[in-house]
Amino acid sequence: MRRLTVVQLLPALHSGGVERSTLEIADALVRSGHRAVVVSAGGRLVPRLEASGAEHIALDIGRKSPLTLRHIARLRWMLTETGADIVHARSRLPAWIGRFALNGLPAAQRPRFVTTVHGLNSPSRYSAIMARGERTICVSETVREYVLRHYPETDPERLRVIPRGIDPNAFPRAASPDRAARAHVVARY
């Protein structure tokens, strides 16, 4: 098996579903012997990411400002230096910055571009980048249908539905009700 370098792009690592999925994918990549790199403005989840063996590169690619465009050249350099095989964009502005960075690389050196559509963003040219990955992951069949309806130029063969799961250790199947709360409810009725 060839060791891959997968670079995930997102605005920040504070909290939320996109961030949790980013950490889970990075952890799975590292455990499988691959190199996981996350590019974001940082946040409280960076220590957890790095504890998994993944790398974090601080670059504010999610700030909605014309000044964010200055990061394109640095991201392009970073993708070359890390030997990125796959660039996985998880949010709109990071996807645009990533796409512009990739377009500046020779085709033979250009990593593959993957996007994940996590939600139903308002249809627009700005949002369309999320449907323009060489592969686009949709987190549900509803998201897939939404992408095809609002971006009809999207090739359905490029879309893959990969539903979000849960960590069964964090959310065990068996209920574990609070005994005091249960006793209170039983006593009340």
Kindly give the residue locations of the regions a language model identified.
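A short helix/loop element that forms part of the nucleotide-sugar donor recognition site in Leloir-type
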Residues: 172-189
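An amphipathic, basic-hydrophobic alpha-helix
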Residues: 62-86, 96-104, 128, 183
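Short His-centered aromatic/hydrophobic patch
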Residues: 89-95, 117
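Carbohydrate-associated surface elements
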Residues: 142, 165
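A conserved, positively charged/aromatic
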Residues: 107-141, 153
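Short beta-strand scaffold positions
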Residues: 36-41, 88-89, 138-139, 161
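N-terminal strand-loop element at the rim of the active site
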Residues: 3, 8-70, 77, 158
